[in-house]
């Protein structure tokens, strides 16, 4: 399509050049003819006669000559004017044809250029949109990775802390158990008697069984049962809780409540299922989940 346009433009340009040369030749011929006519008129014009006082007839002949010359000049001009008018008309037509042809070619190219620019702008907009979506996705991925890394570090930290606490508790329980086993003392009438290892172990088991069967025991009664001071009984309970021999709590009324591991698991499962619970709800659930009825009522 572009080759056809180029050939058409070259043909139009060639016609314009030939037309311009033709007009120029006609103009030069007309100039030569005008020059010859003027020269002929000048040479044919009579010379002015010397003024005379009574020379009226001679002046009238000169006047007639000038009038005739002017008439001949006008006739010559009228003969030349149709040719010049035709040439001017042809020049105007050629000039009008050139902008029209050039305008058609230019409008088509302009339309193609605008369509090309529109497609390019659309592609750029789509590319920018894809890049924006990709950037947002990368940001979301980075945020998710940060959250996952933060959670992983927190879990690792909690596991390390639990492991440290567990190891520390096991070490302390072992130390307390050895100390309790080796130095279990019964105070009788203000005198301390050190027991053998077998007796100490037997008395320790009796102490544990008494608490487990009683379920709820006053600390003063527990101390009196084994001939201990109340503070010593509390210390023994704390040591046994620390090494895992007993599980339970000491309330603010001076009682120890024994809770089995199964009951503790039941309470933990209740809290896990309910999520957030109040103290009153937990106390109400504990009455059904924890058995507080003693197995025996005896004193040593």
Curated annotation (Swiss-Prot):
Keywords: Endoplasmic reticulum, Membrane, Transmembrane, Transmembrane helix, Ubl conjugation pathway. Disruption phenotype: Morpholino knockdown alters craniofacial cartilage development. A motif (UFM1-interacting motif (UFIM)) lies at residues 183-197. The keyword Transmembrane applies. The chain crosses the membrane at residues 3-23. It comes from the Eukaryota. It is a single-pass membrane protein. Residues 217-261 form the PCI domain. InterPro entries: DDRGK_dom-contain, DDRGK_domain-containing, WH-like_DNA-bd_sf, WH_DNA-bd_sf. GO terms for cellular component: endoplasmic reticulum; endoplasmic reticulum membrane. It is found in: Endoplasmic reticulum membrane. Pfam families: DDRGK. GO terms for biological process: cartilage development; negative regulation of IRE1-mediated unfolded protein response; positive regulation of reticulophagy; protein K69-linked ufmylation; protein localization to endoplasmic reticulum; protein ufmylation; regulation of protein stability; rescue of stalled ribosome. Residues 112-173 have a biased composition (Basic and acidic residues). Residues 1-2 are lumenal. Belongs to the DDRGK1 family. Component of the UFM1 ribosome E3 ligase (UREL) complex, a multiprotein complex that catalyzes ufmylation of endoplasmic reticulum-docked proteins. The UREL complex plays a key role in ribosome recycling by mediating mono-ufmylation of the RPL26/uL24 subunit of the 60S ribosome following ribosome dissociation: ufmylation weakens the junction between post-termination 60S subunits and SEC61 translocons, promoting release and recycling of the large ribosomal subunit from the endoplasmic reticulum membrane. Component of the UFM1 ribosome E3 ligase (UREL) complex, composed of ufl1, ddrgk1 and cdk5rap3. This is DDRGK domain-containing protein 1.
